Amino acid sequence: CDMVSHRARLTKTPVIFVNLVGGNDGIIFDGASLVADEEGDIILQAAAFEEFVETVELDVRKPDARGITGGETESIRQALVLGIRDYARKNSFTKCVLGLSGGIDSSLVAALAAEAIGAENLVCVMMPSPFSSEGSIKDSEELVKNLGCESRIEPISATFEVLLEQMNLHKPTKGGESLAAENIQSRLRGVILMAISNAEGRLLLSTGNKSELAVGYCTLYGDTN
């Protein structure tokens, strides 16, 4: 409640906080959705642990919305760098490893890790599959060059094809061949990254984002390593 009010006052913009009601694995969501106006005053508060539907009218034209300032963005960056550096130090890790796909998420984690522990202590592993684009590999190589860290290429295509053949997943099946094949790729990458972590004493950094974590959009035993 206080956080929502603070954000509304800071940005001079109404904030609508919508929260799930119910249990999801080991997490219980309590609902209690709320709306704060541009002054930070709570103008609607839902009951906790009950489903709730309501309509609220807001003037979103005035005052003009204000985005996150550069100072706030810099504070977030500093917090993430400190978090990586401190976690590694307190758990006796001096080196890290991560999977680099060429996308924004893994690229951002790589940049933060290079700053936190030093580029010389970071290994970025590219693990192309039959579905990897040439652009993603090129982008990954360019990032590694800019950061000055070590890069490795560990293709998963051969292992992926063998597993599909062994489990007969390459042939049409009833409901779910594409999902199984997609998740197998992530899990194979997880095996490679954990092997490097164990063999070289490197901390494995996850490259998922908070949106994926919030809705559970990830592969168990793959992205969750």
How does the language model describe each region?
Residues C1-E50:
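CN hydrolase (nitrilase-like) catalytic-core segments centered on the catalytic cysteine
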Residues T94-L100, I104-E141:
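ATP-dependent adenylation/pyrophosphate-handling site
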Residues I16-V18, A36, L98-S101, S107, ...:
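Generic beta-strand/beta-sheet core signal
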Residues A36, I42-I43, E51-V81:
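Catalytic P-loop NTP-binding/switch module of NTPases
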Residues E50-E57, N121-M126, P130, E134-A180, ...:
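A conserved beta-strand->alpha-helix junction
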Residues R85-T94, E115, A119-L122, V162-E165, ...:
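Conserved helix-loop functional segments at active or binding sites
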Residues S75-V97, G190-I196:
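Phosphate/ATP-binding catalytic cores across multiple sugar-kinase/actin-like superfamilies
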